[in-house]
A protein has these predicted regions:
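Short, solvent-exposed beta-strand/turn "edge" segments of beta-rich domains on protein surfaces
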Residues: 1-17, 26-30, 81-83
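Residue-level detector of beta-strand face positions
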Residues: 21, 38, 104-106
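Glycine-rich, aromatic-bearing surface loops/beta-hairpins
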Residues: 109-131
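The feature marks short-to-medium sequence segments in extracytoplasmic or secretory-pathway proteins
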Residues: 23-84, 88, 123-130
């Protein structure tokens, strides 16, 4: 099966998953680039946990490759261009937060990223914990 061991679950519980779906309704290319997204709480930046954060955590937890692959499929791509009517979704991960935070998502537009930057701000996002 694809069950996660307790050590891996414990690592996951230290984090917060934000799972947006991006749908390009414009005629222009829309660029999803997670490095252009910011997270903050109380005026302080929150560092996003990139894909490269996880392999060492999984090694420490003794998580088999099959489960690592399953987890990887759930993550938002780091970079992706979206054309008219294309969508992409997945999880973006930050350290667990006890209070509300803001997510600012910036998207370049145009095939060469030379169009206007579109920005979407979500305020008051809260993590769900197991407690």
């Amino acid at each position: 099966g694809r069950e996660f061991n307790q050590a891996a679950i414990d690592r996951i519980l230290e984090t917060c998953f934000i799972t947006p779906i991006i749908h390009n309704k414009t005629l222009d290319a829309l660029w999803l680039e997670l490095d252009n997204w910011q997270f903050s709480a109380g005026g302080q930046a929150i560092k996003r946990l990139r894909r490269d954060y996880w392999p060492e955590k999984w090694r420490q937890a003794g998580l088999p490759q099959a489960q690592q692959s399953t987890f990887g499929w759930t993550l938002m791509p780091e970079v992706r261009d979206l054309r008219l009517d294309e969508s992409v979704g997945g999880s973006v991960v930050i350290p667990m937060q006890s209070g509300p935070f803001t997510m600012t998502a910036n998207f370049h537009t145009g095939l060469d990223k030379e169009g206007e930057i579109k920005t979407i701000v979500f305020e008051g996002i809260q993590c769900v914990s197991s407690e």
